[in-house]
């Protein structure tokens, strides 16, 4: 009997935790839809905009579980374009995109101004 009670209470705890998850937030602004997605811990995961056809447009930013930026860049009608930035523990990469293809990469680390070009 104790085993069934413990199993039931564990299931209820998991169900309550799942209900605490933040649902994505969408806001319509004219022809664009702003979107905010969340990690399981409630921190923002991604922010950006879609057009009415569902294509990614404008700036998109991604964050880790602690709220630190992982990447930021620009989409034109669903295609990566221009400069994108990717952060990791000790490096920053600047990646130039044209039609979603990488055309240049510059990498910085904590010890030098430009590590790779």
Where are these regions (language model features)?
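Sec-dependent N-terminal signal peptides
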Residues: 4-13
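Glycine/tyrosine- and acidic-biased, solvent-exposed loop/turn segments at the edges of beta-strands
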Residues: 14-117
């Amino acid at each position: 009997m104790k085993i069934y009670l413990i199993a039931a209470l564990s299931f209820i705890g998991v169900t309550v935790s799942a209900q605490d998850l933040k649902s994505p937030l969408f806001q319509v602004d004219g022809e664009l839809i702003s979107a905010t997605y969340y990690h399981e811990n409630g921190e923002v995961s991604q922010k950006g905009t879609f057009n009415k056809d569902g294509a990614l447009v404008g700036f998109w930013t991604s964050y880790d579980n602690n709220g630190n930026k992982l990447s930021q860049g620009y989409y034109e009608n669903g295609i990566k374009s221009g400069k994108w930035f990717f952060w990791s523990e000790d490096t920053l990469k600047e990646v130039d995109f044209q039609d979603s293809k990488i055309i240049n990469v510059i990498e910085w680390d904590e010890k030098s101004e430009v590590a790779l070009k």
